[in-house]
Amino acid sequence: MIVGHRALVAYGREDGRYDVYYSHWGGADLALARQLADPATDPVADEPLSRAVEFAAVVGQYLDPLVHEALFVVDDEPRVYRTLWFGFGGGVDSSVDESSAGGLLVGVDWTDPCDDAHVRAWFAGARAVAAACHKRGELSQTMAATVVERALRDWADDREVIRPPATSGTGRTTGR
């Protein structure tokens, strides 16, 4: 079975806003970044999802950490953010807590495939520990997400870390 590796692409505009596009491929290995960096190519040829969007809206209204594997931002140089989904659930409070439903965006060096793999592996380990504590009833979903976020920010050094508003799994924010 072939599965697409979804991503969002935000093209910077002269007015400081972004045109937002959907990409069905390129999110898994960040290969799309190489195409986006080449001015001779136009890897995103479809109509945009939206035009003239503030960056906060790209992250808060269009990006869903469960659906999208990456966010590519094309300004002077492409910036790539790996999407890291919390995925907590099934613990004592098994209902989905909207404050922990989403995930994080972490800046990665798209020119170094080991960098992306390193970030993903670190997050998988931190999430596994927090999820185990949540399942045992030691942490709520909200606290598990907060612990992982704080640890990632400490570990990330100079990487940009963004916590998008929680989403309902539809790519739209849930009441915040």
Predicted ranges, named:
Residues 1-176:
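Acidic, polar-rich N-terminal leader regions of halophilic archaeal proteins
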